[in-house]
C-alpha cells in the first residue's frame, strides 16, 4: 500500500466513524486523524491507545518539546486516553492536561488461554526464566550477576530465552550449566518454557508494560519484576502473584526468598493463574471498551 493509499484509507475511516481508536500518539495515522478532526465540522472522538508510562525527559529541550506536543493533543476535548494500565500509564495523560473523565483503562492483553495449565508442578531443579530481547535496558547482565552471586551452589538454573544485540557478548561471558541461553522460542516451545518454569524474572531498567508478565502469570508462574516494569502495578502489587523490587539487590533477595519457600511459590502461582483467568483477560478488555463507548455516546 502506497503512502497515498494509506492517507486515503485514514480519511475513509475518519468519515465513516464517530469514534476512532489509534495505537499511539506520535505516528502519522494519529497525527493525520487529529488534524482532520481540527478542521472538520463534524467532530469525532479520537482515542489514543498507549502502554507508555509517564516519563519526563531530563533534557530541557526534549522536555519542552514533549510538553508542547502532548499538551496540545491531550487538552483537546475530543481526544481520549486509552491507558494500558491504571497507574503511571494514566498519569501520562493527566500530566499533560487530559481531564480524568476522558481517560479510560484499556488493559494490556495477550491470549491468556494459550498459557493455562491445570495443575502447576514445580520442577526438581528450580528454574528462573527470562524471556525478552537481550538489549541493554532489559538489564539481563545484572540479572545474571545476581543469580551467579546467590545460586552458584544451589540447585537452580537461569534459563534465558530471546536474542538481541547483547546476545553474543552475554553468551561468551556467562553461558554455563547453570546459565543457559536458549535463543528465540515461539508458539508451543515458548509456552512449554513458561509452564515448566518455577519463577519468571523481569529485571528491566525501563519497561512500558511487559506482556511477558501476563504470559508468565497465565501459566501460573510467579513473577519477580523491577518497579520500572509497567505491569507490576496492576498484576503484582497487592495481588500476591510475585514481588516488585526497588533495586537489583532486593531483586536477588526475592529470588532467594521464593527459592526457599515452595509454599509461598505455589500460593503466588495459584493467585496469578486466578487473576489472569478470572479478571485480567479479554472479557475485561471488552467490558472496558464497551464502558468507554457507552460514555462517549452520551457526549455525542
Where are these regions (language model features)?
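Conserved donor-binding/catalytic core segment of Leloir-type glycosyltransferases
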Residues: 119-138, 144-148, 159
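Conserved acidic donor-binding segment of nucleotide-sugar-dependent glycosyltransferases
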Residues: 237-249, 256-263
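Donor nucleotide-sugar binding/catalytic pocket of nucleotide-sugar-dependent glycosyltransferases
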Residues: 77-117
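Short hydrophobic beta-strand element within catalytic cores of glycosyltransferases
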Residues: 222-226, 236
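Membrane-proximal helix-turn-helix segments that form the acceptor-binding/catalytic region
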Residues: 11, 39, 63-82
Amino acid at each position: 500500500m502506497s503512502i497515498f493509499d494509506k492517507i486515503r484509507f485514514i480519511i475513509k475511516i475518519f468519515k465513516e466513524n464517530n469514534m476512532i481508536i489509534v495505537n499511539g500518539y506520535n505516528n502519522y495515522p494519529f497525527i493525520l486523524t487529529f488534524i482532520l478532526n481540527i478542521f472538520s465540522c463534524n467532530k469525532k472522538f479520537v482515542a489514543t491507545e498507549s502502554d507508555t508510562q509517564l516519563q519526563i525527559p531530563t533534557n530541557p529541550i526534549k522536555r519542552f518539546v514533549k510538553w508542547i506536543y502532548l499538551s496540545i493533543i491531550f487538552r483537546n476535548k475530543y481526544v481520549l486516553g486509552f491507558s494500558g494500565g491504571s497507574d503511571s500509564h494514566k498519569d501520562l495523560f493527566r500530566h499533560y492536561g487530559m481531564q480524568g473523565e476522558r481517560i479510560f483503562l484499556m488493559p494490556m492483553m495477550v491470549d491468556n488461554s494459550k498459557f493455562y495449565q491445570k495443575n502447576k508442578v514445580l520442577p526438581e531443579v528450580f528454574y528462573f526464566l527470562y524471556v525478552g530481547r537481550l538489549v541493554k535496558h532489559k538489564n539481563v547482565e545484572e540479572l545474571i550477576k545476581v543469580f551467579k552471586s546467590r545460586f552458584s551452589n544451589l540447585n537452580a538454573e537461569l534459563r534465558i530465552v530471546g536474542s538481541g544485540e547483547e546476545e553474543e557478548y552475554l553468551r561468551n561471558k556467562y553461558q554455563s550449566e547453570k546459565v543457559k541461553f536458549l535463543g528465540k522460542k515461539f508458539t508451543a516451545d515458548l509456552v512449554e518454557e513458561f509452564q515448566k518454569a518455577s519463577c519468571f524474572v523481569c529485571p528491566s531498567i525501563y519497561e512500558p508494560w511487559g506482556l511477558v508478565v501476563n504470559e508468565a502469570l497465565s501459566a501460573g508462574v510467579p513473577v519477580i519484576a523491577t518497579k520500572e516494569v509497567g505491569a507490576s502495578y496492576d498484576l503484582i502489587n497487592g495481588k500476591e502473584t510475585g514481588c516488585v523490587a526497588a533495586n537489583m539487590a532486593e531483586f536477588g533477595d526475592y529470588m532467594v526468598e521464593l527459592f526457599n519457600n515452595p509454599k509461598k511459590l505455589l500460593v503466588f502461582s495459584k493467585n496469578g493463574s486466578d487473576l489472569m483467568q478470572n479478571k485480567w483477560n479479554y472479557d475485561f478488555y471488552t467490558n472496558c471498551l464497551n464502558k468507554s463507548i457507552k460514555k462517549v455516546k452520551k457526549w455525542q
